[in-house]
């Protein structure tokens, strides 16, 4: 039996185990998919040996990269990994975002506001760049990223001047919805 899973913390919100368990069952695949909630990556080498592949979620999309044997060119460019297969890291977040948002962007002059600077934000920024779309990045502190603005600088007018807002922060994740 092949073993797969997802690593991150928290994982209470994750539908991955249910989704893949159902998919494997429907398609007659001899595999299992489990949640691997971790406080840190201290056992990642053992986990990579035990699993055929796994997904990576918050907060490890960037910090897992030094542990990998190889990294796909796109994931390297993005600076974040969300899929690991046999020790090689990939990023599929960007294409998932691109495919999801494209039907809603009939006007290519839309201005996009990206909240957050973590792994998902990096994938979203990459997708927007691939689509030729301008965006404004919002960070915790002024000067954190060139061309970005701080949350403290967000105004009603600035929010209204952007037709798309993408939340790439952990705000609202279960179980800590606030």
Each language-model region and where it sits:
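Phosphate/diphosphate ligand-binding glycine-rich loop within oxidoreductases
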Residues: 2-104
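Conserved beta-strand elements of the Class I
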Residues: 5, 113-115
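Glycine-rich Rossmann-fold phosphate-binding loop(s) that bind the pyrophosphate
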Residues: 9, 116-118
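Short helix-loop-beta connector
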Residues: 105-111
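N-terminal Rossmann-fold NAD(P) dinucleotide-binding loop
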Residues: 121-122
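NAD(P)-binding Rossmann-fold cofactor-contacting core
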Residues: 131-147
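Rossmann-like adenosine-cofactor binding region
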Residues: 147-178
């Amino acid at each position: 039996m092949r073993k797969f899973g997802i690593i991150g913390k928290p994982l209470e919100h994750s539908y991955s185990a249910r989704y893949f368990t159902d998919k494997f069952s429907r398609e007659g695949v001899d595999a299992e998919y489990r949640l691997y909630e971790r406080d840190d990556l201290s056992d990642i080498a053992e986990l990579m040996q035990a699993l055929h592949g796994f997904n990576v979620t918050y907060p490890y999309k960037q910090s897992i990269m030094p542990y990998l044997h190889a990294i796909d060119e796109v994931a390297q460019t993005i600076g974040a990994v969300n899929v690991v297969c046999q020790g090689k890291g990939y990023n599929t977040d960007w294409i998932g975002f691109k495919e999801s948002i494209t039907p809603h962007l009939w006007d290519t002059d839309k201005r996009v506001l990206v909240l957050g600077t973590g792994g998902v934000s990096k994938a979203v920024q990459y997708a927007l760049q691939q689509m030729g779309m301008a965006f404004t990045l919002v960070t915790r502190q002024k000067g954190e990223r060139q061309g970005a603005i701080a949350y403290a600088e967000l105004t009603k007018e600035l929010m209204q001047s952007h037709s798309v807002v993408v939340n790439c922060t952990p705000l609202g994740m279960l179980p800590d919805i606030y």
